[in-house]
């Protein structure tokens, strides 16, 4: 079967891989000379812990596929795990409730509550001032998104003969056919549209009335940390407990959310929660904020970065905070589920809306999709 894919972000690559592994003849079209969207602008966190319980097996499948892809394609991956640091009693309480809730589940073997000194022995990146303890999880991985996503096409071509057409915009897609900007027609049996936050070019009518919108995030990266300093696991803190759905069932979360809303309403307004990951070059990637829909402006205002840094300093210690880069990314966020997957014409499927989970879930979701979709 001939499969055409629009977009060489992580979603498009995931579909290309899953389709090619099933023996299909795959062609990927990407309008930019190299992937430059959300997939290369993120933390590189394979954030299994942030996923709701019903997504754990898909997230773990994704994680395994990342490790496999890294070996095959030759990019860096670290099974670094993660720590949620607690600097307030309510944060510690939420973490304790989360562990208690998962005591009888498969997740239990991956989780451990650490006291203050155990936490400090796991990372020298935790700010010891007011540190109460942390939640350790061993399931998270780290990749450098830019090098990982940009190295996968060569590997997929080498290993599975996937064809990539970069600098090639798809201007029209319909059953059996893709038309590109140079007027060429390409014939396919199945087409998967992984065009990220571009809701305007292909099937714009499909997005009308659907709870999907763009979300803009501010990000920063430090210079290489001195003397080979390593952060160890990914670090997150109390603000993150409000962000991912996994902590929703914890009874103390509402009180924590209320405290933060009262103490610092701008954090809710700007969707700020803070996290840090460290790439293979020793640089620490820092973020982030969330502005949705009509709030998305092309201008990056420095006050957002200042708020992010102020919160990071409260929970994280770094040998140097000197910044090497600032940027923003935009992803498509679908709020009625973790991905927007819709057949828009016979044999043509739109697959986007992964929000802040695309790096974590794309490989697993694409596998799941191809096992459901087959045979045509
Ligand atoms: C700042 C930031 C931090 C994040 N951190 C994490 C994280 O740590 N962990 C995690 O799991 N997720 C994270 N995410 C989310 C994750 O990055 C996204 O969910 C994911 O990258 C979306 O992938 P995508 O392939 O759908 O979109 P994209 O990466 O945007 O790719 C879409 C591609 O389609 C191409 N395209 C669009 N239209 C056409 C067309 N007509 N013809 C040809 N090509 C076209 C675009 O050029 C683009 O390359 C983060 C996102 C951001 C922005």
How should these model regions be labeled?
Residues 2-27:
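N-terminal Rossmann-like FAD-binding beta1-loop-alpha1 element of flavoenzymes
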Residues 43-122, 131:
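Dinucleotide-binding Rossmann-like beta1-alpha1 core, especially the glycine-rich loop
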Residues 57-58, 85-94, 135-154, 299-304, ...:
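Short beta-strand to alpha-helix junction loop
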Residues 136-175, 186, 190:
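Helical element adjacent to the flavin cofactor pocket in flavoenzyme catalytic cores
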Residues 185-252:
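Central helical "cap/lid" subdomain
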Residues 213-216, 223, 237-313:
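Conserved FAD/dinucleotide-binding core of flavoprotein oxidoreductases
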């Amino acid at each position: 079967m001939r499969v055409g894919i629009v977009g060489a972000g992580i979603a498009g690559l995931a579909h290309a891989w899953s389709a090619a592994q099933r023996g299909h003849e795959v062609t990927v079209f990407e309008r930019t000379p190299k992937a430059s969207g959300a997939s290369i602008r993120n933390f590189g966190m394979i954030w299994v812990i942030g996923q709701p319980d019903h997504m754990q097996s898909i997230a773990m499948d994704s994680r395994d596929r990342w490790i496999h892809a890294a070996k095959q394609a030759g990019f860096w991956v670290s099974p670094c795990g993660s720590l949620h640091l607690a600097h307030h009693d309510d944060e510690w309480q939420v973490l304790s409730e989360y562990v208690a809730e998962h005591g009888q589940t498969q997740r239990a073997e991956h989780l451990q509550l650490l006291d203050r000194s155990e936490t400090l022995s796991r990372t020298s990146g935790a700010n010891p001032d007011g540190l109460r303890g942390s939640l350790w999880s061993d399931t998270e991985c780290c990749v450098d998104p830019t090098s990982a996503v940009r190295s996968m096409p060569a590997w997929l071509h080498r290993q599975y003969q996937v064809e990539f057409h970069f600098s090639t915009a798809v201007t029209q897609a319909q059953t059996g056919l893709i038309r590109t900007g140079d007027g060429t027609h390409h014939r396919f049996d199945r087409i998967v549209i992984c065009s990220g936050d571009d809701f305007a070019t292909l099937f714009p009518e499909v997005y009308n009335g659907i709870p999907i919108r763009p979300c803009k995030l501010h990000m920063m990266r430090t210079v290489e940390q001195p003397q080979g300093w390593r952060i160890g696991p990914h670090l997150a803190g109390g603000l993150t407990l409000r962000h991912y759905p996994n902590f929703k069932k914890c009874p103390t979360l509402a009180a924590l959310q209320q405290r933060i809303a009262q103490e610092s309403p701008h954090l809710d307004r700007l969707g700020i929660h803070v996290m840090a990951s460290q790439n293979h070059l020793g640089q620490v990637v820092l973020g982030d904020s969330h502005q949705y829909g009509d709030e998305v402006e092309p201008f990056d205002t420095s006050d957002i970065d200042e708020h992010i840094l102020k919160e990071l300093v409260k929970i994280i210690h770094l040998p140097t905070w000197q910044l090497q880069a600032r940027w923003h990314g935009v992803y498509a966020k679908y709020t009625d589920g973790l991905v927007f997957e819709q057949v828009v014409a016979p044999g043509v499927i739109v697959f986007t809306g992964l929000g802040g989970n695309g790096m974590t879930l794309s490989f697993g979701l694409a596998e799941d999709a191809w096992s459901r979709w087959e045979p045509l």
